[in-house]
Amino acid sequence: MYNKWFFIESPVWNNEFSFDKRQNKKLFVPEIIEAKSFDEIKFQDDLEKIAFEDFDFDNKLSTNYWLKNFYRFQMWWKEVVLFDNHNHAFYFWYEARSRKIIWNKNLLIHIDQHADTRDNDKIISKSDSKSLEKVFDFTNFVLNVWDYIIPAQKEGIIENVVQIRNTKNLEDYLQNFSNKKNNSKIILNLDLDFFASELDFIDFELKKKVILDAFEKASYVTVCTSPFFVDQRLAVEKFKEIFKEKLL
């Protein structure tokens, strides 16, 4: 899956947002590549390949582009997947389960500006979750950036969620988790909008310390760049800065 780019042209998934108000009626989903260097990360230069589009809080249309590809890295002997909109994490968790990198009842360490836990009564059955094709369709044509975690909990791949969204959450993590041994049932789910300029009041080194501690404990890592919520060049810059010493 994700072995060929495509457009979503119907009012589903993230394309549902303000669909009737937008002149552009399609969103671009790139293909994934295996990357060995951060130098392979390239920004999108095709203006027709919009990653996310909606009206912002000032009611102005915000058109957002991402990178040319999704990227799969091997870092410190574990897999890290980098992509744009956060609901894609849902697919990659199930892909990792199918490859026996993870199994069920994982603890999700969710580091993000937003909770992503809206419950919109979207459910994937246990039988359908074993089909990557059905998981792919559910991810790309049903879920959106706000509601992908609850269906994963209902199905069982995620058991509990640790929400890290502010300074207190970061400090609580260090107090409660940093001294614990590595756990084979942890997924790190990082949104780089945690580094958006409006959150600069949260200490960068504190963010980095928690992210790297969670990274070391996790069996699998999903990272999104959230084009609607943070400048993409800033997001990639922070991604590189945090993980530069982990790349194999």
Predicted regions and their residues:
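Conserved alpha-helical scaffold segments that buttress catalytic/binding sites
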Residues: Y2-L248
